[in-house]
Every structure is written in C-alpha cells, then in structure tokens.
C-alpha cells in the first residue's frame, strides 16, 4: 500500500454527528474476541452511547457471527471467495455497510487488505486494533517476529485506518513486558487481554467526540496526539 498525502484544506476534523445515532458496524474474520469485548462494553453502557448495529464477516462460518447473533445483533456473512477481485468485494462490502448508516466502522480481526476506494469511503471513521506497538511489526505474525527479535516489550495499538497498511495515526497503545519463557501462544494471550481493555476505550472516545481524525493525524480533545498515541 502507499502513503496518502492529506490536504488540510480538503479534510476537516471528523467526529460523529452529536445529534445523530451513534451506530457501529464491526468487521470480523474469525473468533471475534475483540467484538465480544465491545458487546460487553455496550451492555454496560461504556461505548459512548454507541450501538453495534451489524457485524459483517468475509468468512461464512466465523465464530464472530455467532457472537453477534447471540447478542441480538444483525450478523451478515459476505464471503470474499465469491468475488473475482478485491475491488469487487470491497464494492459489495461498501454497499452492505452503508445500508446500516454507521458513524464508526470497527475492524476486529478483519483479515483483509482494504482497497484505496474502501479506505477513502470511510476515512476518518474507521478504527483497527493491531497486535504490536506500531510502527513496529506491521502486518502478520507479530508475536513470532517480536520473540525472534528478542524484544523485552510488546503490546497492541489502536489506530485510524488509512491506505498504508497498519500505518494510520495511532490513538492508543498498551505495553507489556516479554518474559524469557514466553511463547507465541502465551504472548498472544497477554496481548489479547490488553486489546480487550483498549478497544472499547478508543471506541467510546470517538463516539463521545473526543477522538478525531484530521489532516495532521489523530487528535484527542482537540490536541494532536504524539506518534505513538496515548
């Protein structure tokens, strides 16, 4: 993917309409553990007044769809294998998402590289969570790569989605210590527990209007966040 130069005279700070419904669409590909964290936060009124109105998966039997169904949320299977190209799939996905008129799109283990058309359509109102301390270890296999590098700290990051893969402005990070006896599996579980705490907080901030995307980067309460977020 390529970087995009954002022009300050064409992109304004993006926040949800304070008078409109705070509607969330979640995209998943697998088990949906971060989705469950969001569902739990919603049930305790900790999503800034937000409501998850739909969960969409590119994998027909993703367990995340079952989680949505059990929570009374519309669950939509849109298998990517039924489309000839990435562009065709993303075009169909855009149509499904827009039927739900979301204020925010949340990627929760959605294992697809998004097309520029898709990203630009929802720029500034789409968040992702990544299992590393970005900008370190963009892409896949983050835990194995961290262990191979012998790092002593690891973690996860919430960021706005842009055309650069895992390269959008970082909002929030959680750091943890890597033990000498950690394996990929133990490190994954440690990071995942932090993800479940972090993601609902970022979603809440966005829907409360505190967290914004701008041409300069992510802003919190009107102040530009540092490169590594909060």
Question: Residue spans of the language-model regions?
Answer:
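N-terminal glycine-rich "phosphate-gripper" loop used for MgATP/nucleotide binding
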Residues: 57-58, 81-82, 86-87, 100-116
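Conserved acidic residues
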Residues: 53, 103, 124
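N-terminal Rossmann-like dinucleotide-binding module
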Residues: 2-63
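Donor/substrate-binding cores of folate-linked one-carbon enzymes
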Residues: 41, 58, 108-221
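Charged helix-capping and loop-helix junction motifs
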Residues: 88-94
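A short, charged, Gly/Pro-tolerant segment at domain boundaries
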Residues: 5-7, 213-230
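Residue-level detector of anion-binding/catalytic polar loops
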Residues: 74, 103, 152
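Short, surface-exposed acidic-centric catalytic microdomains
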Residues: 48-88
């Amino acid at each position: 993917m390529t970087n995009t130069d954002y022009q300050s005279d064409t992109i304004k700070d993006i926040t949800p309409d304070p008078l409109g419904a705070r509607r969330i669409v979640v995209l998943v590909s697998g088990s949906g553990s971060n989705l469950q964290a969001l569902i739990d936060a919603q049930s305790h009124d900790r999503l800034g007044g937000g409501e998850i109105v739909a969960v969409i998966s590119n994998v027909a039997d993703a367990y995340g769809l079952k989680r949505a169904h059990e929570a009374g949320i519309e669950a939509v299977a849109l298998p990517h294998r039924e489309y000839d190209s990435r562009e065709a799939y993303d075009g169909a996905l855009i149509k499904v998402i827009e039927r739900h008129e979301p204020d925010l799109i949340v990627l929760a283990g959605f294992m697809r590289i998004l097309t520029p058309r898709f990203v630009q359509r929802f720029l500034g109102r789409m968040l992702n969570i990544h299992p590393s301390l970005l900008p370190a270890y963009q892409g896949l296999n983050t835990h194995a790569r961290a262990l191979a590098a012998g790092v002593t700290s690891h973690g996860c990051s919430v960021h706005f989605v842009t055309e650069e893969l895992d390269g959008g402005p970082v909002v929030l990070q959680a750091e943890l210590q890597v033990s000498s006896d950690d394996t990929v599996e133990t490190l994954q579980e440690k990071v995942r527990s932090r993800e479940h705490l972090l993601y609902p907080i970022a979603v809440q901030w966005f829907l409360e209007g505190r967290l914004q995307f701008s041409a300069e980067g992510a802003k919190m309460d009107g102040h530009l966040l540092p490169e590594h977020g909060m």
